[in-house]
């Protein structure tokens, strides 16, 4: 072969790369890995191997010399799972007792007779002999392959060396002695070279463990921190435990930069995982490296840390916030531009919960937290009313107790009304229940004499309680706002039945709705008291308890309630009030009405039945407190029996007030001065509602009054006085013909009137018509005349004292 061809072949082999690992090509099996050994110099190889035998080329003719086989290089192909290397001298190392493939390159390889492997310098001492006839495969005269299996080299032996024995043509002289090739690239050894690592083995193992910890940290923080939204962290800071607040405060500044934090954590996680794979591949190869790195990263770097950070993300994030900030700083040049791009594309990550989502979130929390389930139900109820309308909570009209305006309020009728247990009763005209015109409050009947036979129309005409109407599709929040503004706490519900544009709209009453119905929807529970007949207006679930509404003791003429004061004491109290307070005289209150007011306003406090009271006013039982310093009050107090202790001034001076001492004269003065404003238009619903509307009729005492011993006294509230005043007006202004007509027709009318029409409940029952026998007590006792006059005490008239003594002397 020409020198140019030789150089071309040598250059081609050099391009393959000296001792590089490549896949087998040109028919070589895919499972093998190629090791290429190239001669250091093609020219040197040609010179060294141009003549394999020891005879000189001058002893042969030119034709014979050109046919001598020449070896340029050798390549060893091993299985992929069989690693190989080179020892410190550059000799290729193979695994002993395992077959491998050898590829040799050169010229005139078809002229090779045998290839001999020896571990000495003498080719006549072969260790292995490869016969070209049986084991040799030549490709185009410049490439040949064969398979070889080597035993472990003996000790003190360095390598197997190759000897090439050429073929001898017939008639040619025999070859002389052959020697091993001196090129170490054609040598083989079975000694395994020591494995080289990037770092010392112990340090590399420690680095892998450290990187696994970082991988676990980044993976856990990516899930743990990113699952904590800034809103949740702010919520924890404001309402969480002290430890949680501290953790959230550390995380929040970093978490607000969400995309920057995400990019830094992901970038750090990728870098660490890549480093783990590289270092793990240095420790082992093949399937073992794959399994080791995968198991380490997946189990210790992903599954375990993420499962922990899902539940403990707040604590883990707070304790590792320094490491997180460090990696944000290290990855800032790359992470910051990416995070800004994400901010522009995706926008802010703040997400506000709408009402429905928040409501469903609370509902899910109810089943998980039994301790606060009631509070959560109330919250859900308050949010759900926005989706409800009046017809969802109203009491149907067929279950409403109503009265015609012609009903005569005699004793029997009043007792039946009280037995029904309703405090606000719709009143209709002309026998048409759709024509509700007024509202009768049972409290308006408290001071009426049943023998006067007033009609419902007359009573309603004086009080004129407004009647509120709402549509059945009115949202509950709108109705609640109306109730909050003081527009009553009960409304009649109507429904539009005529939708024709050509005619005026017409309506029909379909029910009644009260503030209690809305409160029940908010509380998600029924509110029952002693006057409820059903516990659910919609489903009509009846209450099984038996009601006791005996009203005869309040309206009977022969038997007074046990808590009422004696007749003699009533007469003396009436005379004292008329003599000493202008507001109780005939020009304001009728005598019969005043008598009923005294009977209904009598209170008795039995101190022996109360708890032992200390000197501290805070420990005084509620029933024993009459007045509290600097607290608004609407009560006028007159002591009949017993004593009340009064504490006055900044020094806490205490005095005792005895019988016929009174308190609250300021209220009576205001009522007398404002009698003209207590007309028909004022609707007296109750003490609390009146106080909210007319604070000008209240006073603020600069003293405290407490009952310290058994005491009987009159407690007349502003609302009770105004009711008595209106009752007196009705008796004075009632036309005579109305009295005669009512007296003439009362028996017939009552026989035909059925007050109880199987009524269902109106959902706002209130207290009994007459106050309880034992109510809030009062207290005072004084010896200083100046103090008594200052508190409004008046001496009892001598005539009153004589009459009282005379009455007491009677059997």
From Swiss-Prot:
Task: Answer whether the UniProt record assigns the keyword Ion transport to this protein.
Answer: yes
GO MF entry, a single one: transmembrane transporter activity
Q: Which GO terms describe its biological process?
A: determination of adult lifespan; magnesium ion homeostasis; magnesium ion transport; positive regulation of gonad development; positive regulation of multicellular organism growth; positive regulation of vulval development; response to magnesium ion
* Tissue and organ distribution: Highly expressed in the intestine and in neurons, but it is also expressed in a variety of tissues including the pharynx, hypodermis, rectum and in muscles.
Q: Where is the signal peptide?
A: 1-24
Chief place of localization = membrane
Side of membrane Cytoplasmic, spans = 226-259, 306-315
**What are the transmembrane regions?**
205-225, 260-280, 285-305, 316-336
The knockout outcome noted for this protein's gene is: No visible phenotype. Double knockout with cnnm-3 results in increased levels of intestinal Mg(2+) and reduced levels in other tissues. This Mg(2+) deficiency in tissues leads to a reduced lifespan, 100% sterility, and smaller animals that exhibit a developmental delay with defective gonad development and which therefore do not produce oocytes or form vulva. In addition, the gonad development defect in the cnnm-1 and cnnm-3 double knockout is rescued when the AMPK alpha subunit aak-2 is also knocked out.
Superkingdom classification of source:
Eukaryota
Q: Which Gene3D superfamilies match?
A: CBS-domain
Membrane topology qualifier: Multi-pass membrane protein
Q: Where is this region: Disordered?
A: 741-760
Matches recorded under InterPro entries: ACDP, CBS_dom_sf, CNNM, Ion_transp-like_CBS
Composition skew (Low complexity), residue ranges: 743-755
Where it sits in the cell: the answer is:
Basolateral cell membrane
Annotated ranges, domain CBS: 394-456, 462-530
Keywords tagged on the record: CBS domain, Cell membrane, Glycoprotein, Ion transport, Membrane, Repeat, Signal, Transmembrane, Transmembrane helix, Transport
| Family assignment from sequence similarity | Belongs to the ACDP family.
Q: What is this protein called?
A: Metal transporter cnnm-1
Write the lineage as a comma-separated list: Eukaryota, Metazoa, Ecdysozoa, Nematoda, Chromadorea
